[in-house]
């Protein structure tokens, strides 16, 4: 089986359908003896340019190992699903399991925010003890 990176963008008004879509696509892949190495839901993001007069879309990234028949089926599903406004399927040489730069940046921001909150709380406690 080959490795693939799949990115699809969902209409922002259909964001509540994304978990169900991910479940269906994951079931199709695992049902054909495939494996999902990485699944990231990036959420709603600003588009670089308008697509069908839309400025935002819900992004989903999947790295999978699956037979070609399943990938063909997924591409057909993307093409005929009106909620999916764009999709891309790329073949990769190896399974990608590490977090994408999008998720890494989000985690770093979260860590900085938590560190700042902890420092602020420590400063407040130190100020209380001095009184």
Swiss-Prot record:
Region (Disordered): 98-131
InterPro entries in the record: Ribosomal_bS6 (IPR000529), Ribosomal_bS6_CS (IPR020815), Ribosomal_bS6_sf (IPR035980), Ribosomal_S6_plastid/chlpt (IPR020814), Transl_elong_EF1B/ribsomal_bS6 (IPR014717)
GO molecular function, one term: structural constituent of ribosome
HAMAP family: Ribosomal_bS6
Keyword presence, Glycoprotein: no
Function: Binds together with bS18 to 16S ribosomal RNA.
Biased composition (Basic and acidic residues): 104-116
Comp. bias (Acidic residues): 120-131
Family, as annotated: Belongs to the bacterial ribosomal protein bS6 family.
UniProt cross-references to SUPFAM superfamilies, sorted A to Z: Ribosomal protein S6
One Pfam match: Ribosomal_S6
Listed name of the protein: Small ribosomal subunit protein bS6
Cellular-component GO terms for this entry: cytosolic small ribosomal subunit
GO BP of this protein: translation
Keywords: Ribonucleoprotein, Ribosomal protein, RNA-binding, rRNA-binding
């Amino acid at each position: 089986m080959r490795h693939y990176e799949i990115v699809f963008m969902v209409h922002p008004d259909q964001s509540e359908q994304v978990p169900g879509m991910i479940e269906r696509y994951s079931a199709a892949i695992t049902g054909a003896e495939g494996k999902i190495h990485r699944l990231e839901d990036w959420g709603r993001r600003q588009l670089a340019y308008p697509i069908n007069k839309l400025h935002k879309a819900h992004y989903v990234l999947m790295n999978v190992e699956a037979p070609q028949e399943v990938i063909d089926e997924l591409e057909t599903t993307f093409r005929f699903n009106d909620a999916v406004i764009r999709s891309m399927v790329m073949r990769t040489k190896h399974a990608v399991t590490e977090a994408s730069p999008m998720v890494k940046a989000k985690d770093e921001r979260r860590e900085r925010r938590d560190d700042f909150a902890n420092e602020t709380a420590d400063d407040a406690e130190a100020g209380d003890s001095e009184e």
